Amino acid sequence: GLINNCGILKRPDGKLIQQAFNHYKKPGATYAPEGETSKAFRKKFSHASRAVKFVGVWDTVGAMGIPISFLGLCDDKDEYYDTKIGKNVAIARHAMAIDEYRSDFEPTIWQPRENMDIQQVWFAGAHSNIGGSYKPDSDNTVLSDNSLLWMVNQAGSNDLAIEPHLKKEARPNALATVHN
């Protein structure tokens, strides 16, 4: 959504990322991707193309990938208001946690768009198991390697360059410890 509205900032304008994010969050037709304000922003600060070949994410939840009420850090203005992937994205992949029970970590399931290659796949584990933030079990495995290997394979099969060590070092184990 952010790239569809604001484009991909040119390197000298990278410092404007917060301004771009604020623009993206504003309601109204002028701030929509084809609105006049968005067009002017992209023309001034961004590369001409907004095309994105592949988006791969792990367990997007709540508001823009973070829980809305987690420790009271977020408010309604940060809620994710559009669960459709932008028309500028060709391929979208989403690894989701099937064993998460906390309401703050409920996945934001994307709504499909016509003519888009989209896959959303459930993996064993809670939110942090999917993205990988826990130490390995005694057998040196973690649940996050399951979703990592899937995402690496998806990206590679769509002609993205993948660092070889990601596949070589992954040790997928669907029976690794669930931390919830």
Model-predicted regions and their roles:
Residues 1-180:
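Active-site- or binding-pocket-proximal scaffold segments within functional domains
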